Amino acid sequence: MNSGFTHITVLLEEAVEALAVRADGCYLDGTFGRGGHSRLILNHLGPDGRLLGFDKDPQAIATGQALAAEDGRFVIVQRSFAELGSQAQELGLAGKVSGILLDLGVSSPQLDDPERGFSFMNDGPLDMRMDPTRGVSAAEFIASAPAEEIARVFKEYGEERFAKRMANAVVQRREIQPFERTADLAEVLKVANPAWEKGKNPATRAFQGLRIHVNNELGDLEAGLEAAMESLEVGGRLVVISFHSLEDRIVKLFMRKLAKGEADNMPRNLPIQYKAFEPKIKIHGKAQFASDVETKANPRSRSAVMRVAEKLR
């Protein structure tokens, strides 16, 4: 399926290099998207290598199915990467996966297609679901949630300073007419935001908060990180690319905790086995960012942060 919307894979070479792909290894691409990372991983795999892709988006699944038809080493499943642990168990891969890649956030085709309802730049139905067949849409949430809950979503997930004021404006307007279109909501948020940031649409943070809430992105990330560590073999690598501070903070703290060993997180008066002092992972290098060349070619890569960890035990 060709949706007509292109996607430029961020940190393509860097992410696959960080995975240290073995020809006979088994790898998971937790965010298949349009398959940029997956195709390069397959190029590094030999005949006995395997790659399993995950995505919730039906258009991504269609692209993945076409790739699977071309290459028998690849399989795609329509699931969140938060479920990769159970999928690995079903396939007998628990503790046997050589590397896992998570490229977080929303893809360019999702943002650029007005019918998906992610963007305030192009008018479309107010949806925002990665999988439009499941869960509550942004319009349904906005229509029924109390002002306090809407404000919490804007503030907690969008880091919006004027969350309460903007949520009240949304509730007042919905009493007159429900929100069905992205441009309609964006206009109300724009008027309610008293302090516009230079170069940024005043609805940006609120839209981010809504999208994260509708798709349970942070909850999925926390579950996916835990599942990834259980699924990896010793020596296997986890590569995560995040696109905003909330995601990156979760990834950074998760990796730091495991790099210190569990004993660092336990009360000092408990009898603790020596093994608890041993780190579970090794963090490879510092956070990596897109190069100047990449950010000029793809401005959306400016906010990308990549972190890499290797499982030790």
Swiss-Prot record:
Q: Which domain of life is it from?
A: Bacteria
GO molecular function terms listed in the Swiss-Prot or TrEMBL record: rRNA (cytosine-N4-)-methyltransferase activity
**The name this protein goes by in its record:** Ribosomal RNA small subunit methyltransferase H
Subcellular localization is given as:
Cytoplasm
State whether keyword Lipoprotein applies.
no
What residues bind S-adenosyl-L-methionine, as annotated?
Answer: G35, G36, H37, D55, F81, D103, Q110
Q: What HAMAP family does this protein's entry cite? A: 16SrRNA_methyltr_H (MF_01007)
Asked if Flavoprotein is a keyword of the record, the answer is no
Q: What does this protein do?
A: Specifically methylates the N4 position of cytidine in position 1402 (C1402) of 16S rRNA.
Per the record, the GO terms for biological process are: rRNA base methylation
- GO annotations of cellular component type: cytoplasm
- One Pfam match: Methyltransf_5
Q: Which reaction(s) does its UniProt entry say it catalyses?
A: cytidine(1402) in 16S rRNA + S-adenosyl-L-methionine = N(4)-methylcytidine(1402) in 16S rRNA + S-adenosyl-L-homocysteine + H(+)
Identify the species of origin.
Answer: Pseudomonas syringae pv. tomato (strain ATCC BAA-871 / DC3000)
